[in-house]
Amino acid sequence: MRQKTLDVLEFEKIKSFVADETISDLGREKVQEMAPASNFDTVEFQMNETDEISQIYNKHRLPSLSGLAKVSPLVHRASIGGVLNVAELNRIKRLVQVQNQFKTFYNQMLEEDEEVKYPILHDKMNHLPILTDLFKEINETCDAHDLFDHASYTLQSIRSKISRTNQRIRQNLDRIVKNQGNQKKLSDAIVTVRNDRNVIPVKAEYRQDFNGIVHDQSASGQTLYIEPNSVVEMNNQISRLRNDEAVERERILTELTGFVSAEADALLIAESVMGQIDFLIAKARYARTIKGTKPTFKEDRTIYLPNAFHPLLDKDTVVANTIEFIDDVETVIITGPNTGGKTVTLKTLGLIIVMAQSGLLIPTLDGSQLSIFENVYCDIGDEQSIEQSLSTFSSHMKNIVEILQDADQNSLILFDELGAGTDPSEGAALAMSILDYVRRLGSLVMATTHYPELKAYSYNREGVMNASVEFDVETLSPTYKLLMGVPGRSNAFDISKKLGLSLNIINKAKTMIGTDEQEINAMIESLEQNSKRVDQQRIELDRLVREAQQTHDALSKQYQQYQNYETSLMDEAKEKANQRVKSATKEADEILKELRNLRDHKGAEVKEHELIDKKKQLDDQYEVKSIKQHVQKKKYDTIHTGDEVKVLSYGQKGEVLELVGDEEAVVQMGIIKMKLPIEDLEKTKKKKEKPTKMVTRQNRQTIKTELDLRGYRYEEALNELDQYLDQAVLSNYEQVYIIHGKGTGALQKGVQQHLKKHKSVRQFRGGMPSEGGFGVTVAELK
């Protein structure tokens, strides 16, 4: 896109605002590189990229990118044998730290809401390298200022020697400065440092009293800084140790630089990705300041910008306008007062196109739609503040000639006051001829004009729409409101009347312009009112459609969650049913064992194969198929009482005990009796029964799965509870309900304490609202 267009539309100011939102030089470099793309896939990708980060930015607290800096020059120097210092190593460490923190934040965000997907950001996170070892090496070796003493054994030993030697020097010099005989000879009773040597400040006249080396003197020459001979050798030792320390520091830094060099490619990837993240977050921050929204890009020639406003104008006073090229409209001509905001409308459209194709969210309501243009051409100048002259006309015409040479069907052209600066009749004719030419090129065009001849231009040409900016005759000022589809009308009579011009003069003037023009003005006024009403209705309709779509999406999500929950409940119910059958099978094994003992010891006439056959009948009740895997049921004859059936929803076999009407049946599945829909039953072939000799066992009394203790005294209730639990265990109940009511809570407390101690109770809990709430305790039996 032409740089001249970007300059006229002030895109650099937009980039400046985005750059202000970045944290690092990496992000600012990305902003400076930002420019409108023209490839459809590229533009759409950039917009989706920004939208993803904006969604995250608006919903979450992002980790800080503070300290993120460019490291590629350091990595390059490390790769060619240079040695990095501590500060430079810390810049690399901070890059790794920032990328790790952001990746951790991203993973935690996904765990909180697994259904939300950010495919573009996810891909960036997958590209971030693992640099844990490098971070650990740097972090354990140095801080922001220097190498740690423990960076190596040698360094620790050297620094320890330096510390001990310094301490001896200090002690020696402290004795000298604290000696009473030396007090008057010293400028100050302190130990100081000159040329990296420990010295004392001696008055010049007492130089001969101190044997040592003079390292410096004061500006006045009255103080000499002397290193006493008693510490010279110790200071020499420190100098040697300092040299040893420097050598060891260089060795350690060289080693760390080697680690950096080994991860050079990974560090460059991390720098690139985190620079992009900084850039995208800056876009998101700027989007929030202008309440930016994501447009939908269309392959066809479409522009629809609901309530668009210029992002560089004051948000509190700027007027938002809906700009659109509807149906087959290719040219929009805006007429109206010179100060009515026509130029702002042109710049708003052009700048929004440039922003969108640069991957920036745009200042409109939701629902905007845009084509992607190869080029946006502008002929916009401040025609209102300079005198119209030949030179002005020539300047504009030169620009227009360049535009017409390059424009094509993939161009958007913005003409401000087309044909102005010359004779009105010639200017209007030129304007119409130029519009005809660009229409033949296939370009989309928006042009402003104050020539009345262009109002009629759209009526005898297809694909051309009039528009105007509204003027308030009450306040005698423009409202800056754009009216699409409505040509501008003259307000001279209304303004004159408002200013007090005689009605006789106004009426006489009206007779001079003819009835047709008066009717046209009246028609335009009516169109203005209708246009405003339709515009408001359109915006409201768009809002309702968006809300309906959001509701639809939310309900679809809830429905899917419900289906998953329902399937989970069914599988859980199947598992519980199988557990009950398994428990019954275990009990049957115990019974068979008792029967065998009876047979063996008392000679009961029961044959082994008969016992096994009965056991198998109970085993046949148990299936492990998932609810999701049940097959389509086979229909045999009509189901009758006594038939053996398979319950499809549970995957269990049972016997029909009773038919309830034509649609339901009572079925016994092992120890479970349930009322089920007949359509959920599949008739199975009944096995032939062999005559068997029966060993009878006394039936236990049938009890309910609930015990109502309301009205009982405390001791009576606990006795009743003990008896009930024993019977429930014998009946192989896995879960029972103890109804104690709410009352004062004493009985509830007593029941629960008793359940806690009872040997047959595995655990207990308070009742759910559907089970009776606090008035019920649910006990699970062993």
From Swiss-Prot:
Record-linked CDD domains: ABC_MutS2
Q: What is this protein called?
A: Endonuclease MutS2
Q: What is its EC number?
A: 3.1.-.-, 3.6.4.-
Q: Family assignment?
A: Belongs to the DNA mismatch repair MutS family. MutS2 subfamily.
Alphabetized Gene3D superfamilies for the sequence? 3.30.1370.110, P-loop containing nucleotide triphosphate hydrolases (3.40.50.300)
Source organism: Staphylococcus epidermidis (strain ATCC 35984 / DSM 28319 / BCRC 17069 / CCUG 31568 / BM 3577 / RP62A)
Residues bound to ATP: G336, P337, N338, T339, G340, G341, K342, T343
Name the Gene Ontology biological process terms: mismatch repair; negative regulation of DNA recombination; rescue of stalled ribosome
Keyword ATP-binding set for record: yes
Subunit comment for this entry? Answer: Homodimer. Binds to stalled ribosomes, contacting rRNA.
What SUPFAM superfamilies does the database record attribute to this sequence? DNA repair protein MutS, domain III (SSF48334), P-loop containing nucleoside triphosphate hydrolases (SSF52540), SMR domain-like (SSF160443)
Q: Which keywords does UniProt give here?
A: ATP-binding, DNA-binding, Endonuclease, Hydrolase, Nuclease, Nucleotide-binding, RNA-binding, rRNA-binding
* Lineage top rank: taxon: Bacteria
